[in-house]
Amino acid sequence: MMKKIILTLFLSGFIVNTYAQEKAKSQVKEKEIEGVVITKTKKAVEQKADRTIFDFSEQPQLNNGNVLEGIKKLPGLVSTDIAGMMYQGKILDVYLNGRPLNITSNELNSFLEGMPANSVDRIEVITQPGAEFPATSGGAIMNIITNKNANKYLTATYSGNYSFTNYGKFRSRTSNSLNLNARNKYFGWQLNIGQNYRESMLNTNQNDLLLSNTDRIGRGYFAKSGLTFDLGHDRLLVNYDIYHNKNSNYTESNGFADLPFIPVKDSIREGYFHAFDAAYTNNLRQEAVVTYQKRFSDKSQKLDFQFGYTKSTSKFDQNNIYRDINYINPDYSFPRFSDGILLNNESDMRIANFKVDYSQPIKILDGGKVSLGGLYEKQNFDTQSRGLTNLDYQRQTASTYLEFQAKLKKFDFTLGVRAENYDISGITRVIDSTGSVVQKDLLPFNKFKLFPNASVQYSLMNQVSLSANYNKKISLPSISVLNPNNTTFQGPNTQVNGNPNLQPTIFDNYEIKLSAFDYAFIGYSVSSAKNQVAQIIRKEGKNLFNEQVNISNMRIHNFSVGLPVPFMIFSKPMSEIMKFNFNPDKINFMYIYAGYQKHEIDNLNNRGFWIFNVMTQLILPKQIKLTANYSYLTPRAGYFYFTAEKPFSNTVDITLTKKFLDNRLTVSVFANDIFNGQVMQVRSNPPNGESVYLRSKYDTRNFGISINYKIPTKNKLAKEDPNILNNTKKEDSGGVMQQDK
């Protein structure tokens, strides 16, 4: 058995090396250096010292739906409606093209559902953010990169998708996107536009006190534009992005509650209700970024200046169309009526920042590099309910960092520190029982803190390394959890509120990891958090409360292992295998991921849970590629303040892919959640109040087709412009900068 494992690891490295040679002839990234085109292979999964990179552009099983659906298929990632996203035990801060979205929970899910997955190039999960990343990155960063380059002198790439579900009735989903790029002697430009239409269903049961069935219609539009001007060796980049989502929810609900007895003023009686409500959400997010890249004779010396401005507005209305009430003790049926407008909420977020990043090589040990820079950011966030501004929140952050990287024989060292100063303040306003407006100050947060990071990596052999990492981070409450208003659904017995008095979370993250080639690894990490933000759901009488709280102390332990297994090791002798000409696009293999995670919270006995993910690729006749994904999380385990009664994930997805026209046209047919096993069923464990049973079911089983067509230009002398759509990334050698390669 040990020989098989060693052989598997050896083959993984051999496949990667051969892959780099074979794929350079077809799937390539193009890079211009003084008129010469250099090719670089795109890998499905790439392990680096501080991150894991998942390619979406060439993975039909990931890009055949919306972004949220693709993310949920990534091995090691857990995404739930009740506690957000985690990767290998670390809370994820979600970035889009290098800039934090600053939203979580339902607002984040809605945003990601509105983005077609075929508009994403790759996703980087940065498990060890260095000093150059804002300390507010928390445990880890998931950076969604939408930038794309067309290959083979392409000037346009079209991607389209259609799928459907059939739960009680037929529901359709479509998405389309187009990527254009061109260049003249003055400047280069890129434009990426797309739309998404999505019909879906959601059924919920909240402790048998509220049962609902929701028909959801989501409409999303986006446009990403970029201009680049070459100024000698320097470069000026101008980007403008816009994302617009309009969603409609139609909810039929019934339940049992303490209800106002309408015939008698200020009287309450038990009763059953049946209602129909319509809710409308209108979200608009705009970003503008200007970057100046100063370059020197030494290509590894870089200086970047960047100014960015983000404005995000949200409107949410819920109208009660009708309501029926049957009171008991004694029985009395009130005629059908309408409650009219139940919720009328708005929010407005504005963020402006300016940052400087500088890096250069230094002579230290066997060679090294120093990176330093600074950031100033100002955020304003206010919310309104029925015209009353009930939250006015301001944050100013000033930070600077210094990080050294050095190499000594087989060792690589990183040592850095980031200093950040926070000034957070604001006011809240509520209407009391007398109808008067009461204003209070938020709990201020005025602190200066240092955030160190350190890592060491030892190369055991070529492409096999052992690494150890530590970093201290902070996570500021997102606008989603600060918002005191309900932006989801309000029933007669449900209260959903944010908490504007939440305090920031401080993380101490430790990790040790053994990586072999780009796919195999085994690792253990622990994240210790103070004031971790968490959702609780509790019951008082017949009323349900959904709230946000700080957990004073929490630790998350995570053990994970990933291993690729080529099927030929079970059927061919080693002598024959070593003569085989490997190409991952043309061999049958399986990738196995397993992880164990345990959430330790004071005064709460949480059991750990296992995460399993298996991806299998089979090459069928006519070069048809079959990809199957199976994902499963063990039930009866603790997840923050919830116990999973059924697995958070239990899905089987299958994708069949065929390429045509010299690989310019890719057609895929797919089936997701074939056995309809995906359901969320949990029981809450609130620190105060009664436990609540919760069940929600989406129409996750869907079938569809997706296409991707790359249109070649007739002018063979035409040149592509590099990625100029807004993207901040850390280069392999360190430093945060606009991508220019």
Language-model features: locations:
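Short acidic/polar hinge/loop motifs at secondary-structure boundaries
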Residues: 73, 101-127, 178
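Extracytoplasmic beta-strand/coil segments of soluble accessory domains associated
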Residues: 68-104
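Face-selective signature of the C-terminal outer-membrane beta-barrel domain
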Residues: 224-246, 272, 277-431, 459, ...
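Outer-membrane beta-barrel signature, preferentially recognizing the C-terminal barrel domain
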Residues: 392-393, 442-445, 474-528, 546-560, ...
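Short, acidic, small-residue-rich periplasmic hinge/interaction motif at the N-terminus
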Residues: 21-60, 80-82, 89-91, 127-129
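N-terminal periplasmic accessory domains that precede
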Residues: 24, 35, 67-70, 110-111, ...
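Transmembrane beta-barrel wall of Gram-negative outer-membrane proteins
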Residues: 168-199, 208-252, 280-288, 294, ...
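Surface-exposed extracellular loop regions of Gram-negative outer-membrane beta-barrel proteins
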Residues: 423-435, 462-509, 524-542, 672-688
